[in-house]
Amino acid sequence: MLKTDALLYFGSKTKLAQAAGIRLASLYSWKGDLVPEGRAMRLQEASGGELQYDPKVYDEYRKTKRAGRLNNENHS
């Protein structure tokens, strides 16, 4: 689930944070383009299914991230 999609759906960062069950300040610590996986299912429920949590998206993100680390010039 993309953060931009969640923000567009809920309309404000405050409402997104409330739906995710977090403080607004915690929302600013979300890194990357994806909603943290632990919050994605909650947002799916809060949106009545309009937003979708897809575990495959998160699995692919992790695979890509790991592959990038292995290609780092400091690794052999």
From Swiss-Prot:
Question: Which domain of life does the UniProt lineage start with?
Answer: Bacteria
Ranges of the DNA-binding region feature: 13-33
Query: What are the record keywords, sorted?
Result: Cell cycle, Cell division, DNA-binding, Repressor, Transcription, Transcription regulation
UniProt-recorded Gene Ontology molecular function terms? DNA binding
Q: Is Kinase included in the keywords of this UniProt record? A: no
Q: Which InterPro entries does this chain map to?
A: Lambda_DNA-bd_dom_sf
> Tell me, what is an example of a GO biological process annotation in this record?
cell division
Q: Does the keyword Repressor apply?
A: yes
| Function, as annotated | This protein is a repressor of division inhibition gene dicB.
Give the NCBIfam families listed for this entry: PRK09744.1
Name the UniProt record assigns to this protein = Repressor protein of division inhibition gene dicB
Its organism's taxonomic lineage begins at: Bacteria, Pseudomonadati, Pseudomonadota, Gammaproteobacteria, Enterobacterales
Q: Which gene encodes it?
A: dicC
